[in-house]
Amino acid sequence: MSDKNILHNFLLVLILSFTWQNIFAQKIVFGQITDGQTLQPLDGASVILENSNIGTISNHIGMFRMKLPSKSSRRIKVQYMGYKSRNIILNKKLCVNDSICCNVELQPKNNILSDVIVLGKSKAQRHREVPSAITIIDSQELKYKTATLNEILDNAAGIKVAQQGGLGNASRIIIQGMDGKRIGIFINGMPMGNSDEFQLSSIPIDMVDEVEIYKGIIPAWLGGDGLGGAVNIRLKDFKKNHLEMAFEAASYNTYIGSLQLKHYLGKTSTALHAGATMNYAKNNYSFSSPFELGRIIHRDHDAYTHGGFNVGISSQQWWFDQFDLTLSADYYRKEIQGGLMNVQNNIQHAFTRTRSASTSLSLEKSFLKGKLTAQFHSIVGFSLVNQVDTSHYCYDFIGNRFPSGSGRGEIGAVPNDSHDRHTTVRELLNLTYKIGNNQLVTWTTNYRYGCKMPKDELADSYSRLPTSGYPSRLHSIVSGLTHELKLYGGKFTNELGIKLFNHHSEVLPFAEAIMLQDKLKASTNRCTMAGWSEAMALHLLPNNALTLKASVQSTVRMPIAEELFGDGVLLLPSEKLRPERSFNINAGAIWLINAMRYPQVRIGINTFYMSAKDMIKLMYSSMNMAYDNIGKVRVMGIDMEMESKLNRWLDLQGNITWQDARDMRKEAVGGGENFHYRYRIPNMPYLFGNVGVRLHKDGLLSKSSSSAFASTFAFTKAFSYNWEASKHNTMLIPARYCWDVAVHHSFNKRFQLSFEIRNILNRENWAEFRYPMERRTFHLKMKYIINKI
């Protein structure tokens, strides 16, 4: 080999060496810090590079990211209060491309002094201490349940879920006297619509890690609109390879199944995840008709079917601190049950069906050495909705069959075989900037788009009009700016925010379809409003055991697609709807007694006042229905809750809520005196609560086993589903009492078995509009978990 070639090769090796050193100098260490026992993320854990002043802290999801300078130590120290510190060597096995992936599990300190156990504050308790009025349902409360999310929420303080039957039937969430469309639903912070649009029963409880219920004020970072509050569902995020399968069988041919899979690619933080759900319920129970004494009605056309799956990829090692892309598809089919509001209409053939597909993208990135954090969530969904009502015959509950009054169809004036196409886009952008150690500025923008393309050729041929309506579009933007200030070492927190609400819709009103024969023009509705809020929290006593909080808010709820577009069957378009407005006040306190040892007791109290106007209500005519702005409502009330951990194996809990919602319109619709002025709002429970006890013990049957027994008793005072104009009101929903018991056993932390009896007293209970509920039901659930796949 010539000297020239030797020199050339030497220079090449030298250049490559310097290049490698430069790449290594720019390495970034990243990862997630979690509790080694619960795998919950640790917010605020410190990561320090040995023999340097370089360090960082983990964010709210436990993620950290830190640059490693050249020739620095390759050892980091991870610390968190109440946990054992860890020293970690960053070796080549952790390298991923030009970065180092280092996920850290910290073990809690085992501070045991005789029978005194140091407990400290859980993540859920820290969430409760925020300025907003909030109820937290954590993973420990969900652990022993076989119930659906609707039933879980129904037992929370200040919350009531009004259902119209078994699994798959319509339900609405009531928070502080506001219900349904006024309650926002979020999943991992992403707005999914309101509680009327989104079916909580479609989410298996085994996929849920925590439920946050915001009462009155919706936090700025959620970014949605609403009057009564919001429900944010945090799904489980597994930090290791994980496969989980669950199946439940219950009375009345009810079956619920779910599967969750997450598989990490090698030793990277990139993972593939998938999930599947299956729900089926025949709902074939009987009830005593409230309209005809002695008549027993059997629900024989109320079956519900739901199947869904999702696949996706997530990563923490790419340019983004957090990346997740998910594709999902769902199928729903629901039979329509007759005889609920009368005894004549025994529907036997009509049903609804929905097929949908969506894609969701979540991104998170920190800038400026962690001072600025950007989060972006996007969901694009498509759905095809069918309402099928084509029978030539109608039926009654005596067994008679007779021809349909319109020739075909059991429900409306004309038959239906609709093929309505819906397109939805929901996007959320959060920017959070940290100023020093005690200030945060958050800017949030939420965009929502909805488009309906109705089609029902069968109905149009009978009515000779486009019965299902015309194409309609909806755009809305909610943008808000919030400033958070913490003083006196975090003992005082103040949040001040402002929001702008913009609404734009294009709807072809149904009235023009009747009156005009030429080309129709869309009715355009534009509206821009502003809202504001202020919330504060003051922590007192050692360990911040007492938290006082108060909040005030002027907020807006914009009309949704269903209210504007109609349904093409009985519900007409309402193109001139105005947004609802509300002024809300909340004040409360949380007292944590013996925060660091047994017996531990938490007492919470919250009072509220709300004054809402331009309330959107459903108005009835002889043939159809339509929404209109006619309402003015005042709500006031109080909710209290108590939770106690008496010792290692015994927990107690209870709550009670009183709310008073009144009609405050002095003038009736169309003029004249409103005879319902100051009457209680119909179909709104005003006094309800529940108590529960839970016994749990580890190692009872074997060293790695866990056993539990739980019992809850819930009550709802009788209330009217019409205006209480007379002391002898016949439209009354009787008081509801329900006693449930459950046992749970976990074998070697993999196989779990649960058995629950609901309504053990076998009472005949009724829900809103006196819809009948199930009597005693039995539920058997099995779950199997594999952490090595």
Language model regions located:
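Gram-negative outer-membrane beta-barrel transporters
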Residues: 491, 602, 607-611, 628-720
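A beta-strand signature from Gram-negative outer-membrane beta-barrel systems
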Residues: 102-104, 205-242, 787-788
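Membrane-embedded beta-barrel scaffold of Gram-negative outer-membrane proteins
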Residues: 541, 549-553, 580-636, 657, ...
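Short strand-turn segments of transmembrane beta-barrel domains in outer membranes
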Residues: 210-212, 219-220, 235-264, 295-304
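Face-selective signature of the C-terminal outer-membrane beta-barrel domain
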Residues: 312-332, 354-517, 523-535, 539-543, ...
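Short acidic/polar hinge/loop motifs at secondary-structure boundaries
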Residues: 65-67, 190-216
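Periplasmic-side early beta-strands and strand-to-turn transitions of outer-membrane beta-barrels
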Residues: 240, 248, 265-348
